[in-house]
From Swiss-Prot:
It comes from Rattus norvegicus. GO terms for biological process: intracellular signal transduction; myoblast differentiation; negative regulation of cell cycle. Serine/threonine kinase which acts as an essential component of the MAP kinase signal transduction pathway. MAPK12 is one of the four p38 MAPKs which play an important role in the cascades of cellular responses evoked by extracellular stimuli such as pro-inflammatory cytokines or physical stress leading to direct activation of transcription factors such as ELK1 and ATF2. Accordingly, p38 MAPKs phosphorylate a broad range of proteins and it has been estimated that they may have approximately 200 to 300 substrates each. InterPro entries: Kinase-like_dom_sf, MAP_kinase, MAP_kinase_CS, MAPK12, MAPK_p38-like, Prot_kinase_dom, Protein_kinase_ATP_BS. SMART domains: S_TKc (SM00220). Its main location: cytoplasm. Binds 2 magnesium ions. Dually phosphorylated on Thr-183 and Tyr-185 by MAP2K3/MKK3 and MAP2K6/MKK6, which activates the enzyme. GO terms for cellular component: cytoplasm; mitochondrion; nucleus. This is Mitogen-activated protein kinase 12.
Length: 367
């Protein structure tokens, strides 16, 4: 049996949990961190700076047009985002030397250490930590939304946190295809806005605000706020707290089926949020009442939520970084697999690091 060709100059090969990795020699001490539906992540040390980084390898990104489209979109979104509360790219590389050989690429990002889901399992969060974490979520969302991107699947596991309680949003804007279309992966609907769960209408950026409300409530009480067993059960759980919506809201629903269903529901009174969120401060309750609104048009935006008195002590007068609009017209073009490979290869080669390589990485991107 012929042995594989030697690693590309400046690269080395290593097997990590039965998968061959071929990475740039500057990234040492590969350690598996986790894996999901689309890829695996290792931590490594950037030998130029001594900083720990996370390297993501996508599983066979070019196995189908659907996977290729997703890989291309993930790469372009990561290249686009430059905000301290949104994960961005430090580097991207391929061990393949030509377009004809191009089958894999690796995404290098700041290593954060843990995620909010794991953090909540291990400790009870104090009010000031909750405040700081929610503030960062909203700052990141304000930036993502200004770029014209909707996250769509915000949950504790998508919020990376380091030991200084600094937070970055992961996996934004990727949940565009139905998840089952990709891998049959089961999605967590507990944090999803009702209009997403039930496909009520074209949804807007405030779907992400609903998710922040669910996450914030869970941080306060230590319990998942709406834990439904299926779509309709999820809606019932939500309406036990929000109450059934008024007729004018039901009229806005685009689906006749959804309208009929909603009209047939027994009327439920809105609960007093303070009784649901024991231990929450009045300002926290007031903010949550503005986020967890069934009617998406009545929900606060990220910018409005940031202006809420709850964040008075944290508000930063410095100018927020301005988001450039993300042009997604490239993402929805119909392309052959070879064309997806070609445009992705071009994106990999055109990457410019966010700052001088070799410079000390600032605190917010390092553990």
């Amino acid at each position: 049996m012929s042995s594989p060709p030697p690693a590309r100059k400046g690269f080395y090969r290593q097997e990590v949990t039965k998968t061959a990795w071929e990475v740039r020699a500057v990234y040492q001490d590969l350690q598996p961190v986790g894996s999901g539906a689309y890829g695996a992540v290792c931590s490594a040390v950037d030998s130029r700076t001594g900083n720990k980084v996370a390297i993501k390898k996508l599983y066979r990104p070019f196995q189908s047009e659907l996977f290729a489209k997703r890989a291309y979109r993930e790469l372009r979104l990561l290249k686009h985002m430059r905000h301290e509360n949104v994960i961005g790219l430090l580097d991207v590389f391929t061990p393949d030397e030509t377009l004809d050989d191009f089958t894999d690429f690796y995404l290098v990002m700041p290593f954060m250490g843990t995620d909010l889901g794991k953090l909540m399992k291990h400790e009870t969060l104090s009010e000031d930590r909750i405040q700081f974490l929610v503030y960062q979520m909203l700052k990141g969302l304000k930036y993502i939304h200004a770029a014209g991107v909707i996250h769509r699947d915000l949950k504790p596991g998508n919020l990376a946190v380091n030991e200084d309680c600094e937070l970055k949003i992961l996996d934004f804007g990727l949940a565009r295809q139905a998840d089952s279309e990709m891998t049959g992966y089961v999605v967590t609907r507990w944090y999803r806005a009702p209009e997403v769960i039930l496909n009520w209408m074209r949804y807007t950026q405030t779907v992400d605000i609903w998710s922040v409300g669910c996450i914030m409530a869970e941080m306060i009480t230590g319990k998942i706020l709406f834990k439904g067993n299926d779509h309709l059960d999820q809606l019932k759980e939500i309406m036990k707290v929000t109450g059934t919506p008024p007729p004018e809201f039901v009229q806005k629903l685009q689906s006749a089926e959804a309208k009929n269903y909603m009209e047939g529901l027994p009327e439920l009174e809105k609960k007093d949020f303070a009784s649901v969120l024991t231990n929450a401060s009045p300002q926290a309750v007031n903010l949550l009442e503005k986020m967890l609104v069934l009617d998406a048009e009545q929900r606060v935006t990220a910018a409005e939520a940031l202006a809420h008195p709850y964040f008075e002590s944290l508000r930063d007068t410095e100018d927020e970084p301005k988001a450039q609009k993300y042009d997604d017209s490239f993402d929805d073009v119909d392309r052959t697999l070879e064309e997806w490979k070609r445009v992705t290869y071009k994106e990999v080669l055109s990457f410019k690091p966010p700052r001088q390589l070799g410079a000390r990485v600032p605190k917010e991107t390092a553990l």
